[in-house]
Amino acid sequence: MITTVEDGKAITLQGNPEHPITQGFLCWKIQNALKFVYSPERLKRPLKRVGKKGTDNFKEITWEEAYREIAHQMENVRTKHGAEAILPFHYYGHMGLLNKQLPQRIFTTLGTSNCSPTVCSNAGRTAMQYVYGGFWGLDPEEIPSSKLIIFWGLNGPWSNLHGYNMVKQAVRNGAKFYVIDPLKTGKLGKHLAIKPNTDGVLALGIANYLITSNMYDKEHVEKYTHGFEQFREVAKGFDLERVSRITDLSVEDIRELSEDLYRIRPSFIHLGFGIQKHL
């Protein structure tokens, strides 16, 4: 991002055309970032509650006063009840490299309790670790050269705009694009309007079809996987007709998706939080 500054104040924000992912384009949120930075309603000093919880009785204090009071309260709790009585909780407001990790170093040093900050991403992360051994994905710069792209449980135009623009490049280059989502979230690609909460059934149905059709890499499975026979038994009960009834997707679409997954290489599968955010 390129920022123009005059007299110590940011005047304009522009995308960096040399950036390999954004390619000079800023999302709508960042295009309007200066409105938030210089908003007269923005809080610039800490507020301390001086009334009962649930009321709007606050007063401004200095940063030094805030640091001192917070440190005093934390030390008081640690002395009386132990460090584990302190429970830090933070997530999306602190996703920068420094402002995310530095507070965690403080809490780790103090020996406080720690909990997962989210009910969504860690569930998927743990599942990915069990299946793949890790949760790191492909480089987004590989999207334009992919021949098959699947966005599963992901609203690309809204939550992954830069990646979605790369998908457009790939489609222009001849790639096939699927979107698996109950809602139609864009004009691009083939939309599979899956019934909510049935993504696992679709995955098992795809696996069963590929296994029974002998469309999988046996050498890779034998060399790098454990429990394949048990997985085969679990997937066996999910034939295309049953999966179609449960997911509200046609047998033809499920078969086409399955065969494309086997035949079209290289592929790029992007899993979104949508798969995890249901009961």
Language-model features and meaning:
Residues M1-S213, S250-I254:
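N-terminal export/assembly segments and adjacent metallocofactor-ligating motifs
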Residues S39-L43, I211-F238:
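Scaffold signal of the M16-like zinc-metallopeptidase fold and its non-catalytic homologs
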Residues D56, G189, V221, E233, ...:
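Short, flexible active-site loop motifs that bind/organize anionic cofactors or intermediates
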Residues T79-A83, S116, K176, M215-Y216, ...:
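Intrinsically disordered or highly flexible coil/loop and linker segments, enriched in small
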Residues G82-Y91, V119-N122, K218-T225, R245-I246, ...:
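Short coil/turn segments at secondary-structure boundaries
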Residues I206, T225-L279:
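Active-site phosphate/pyrophosphate-binding segments
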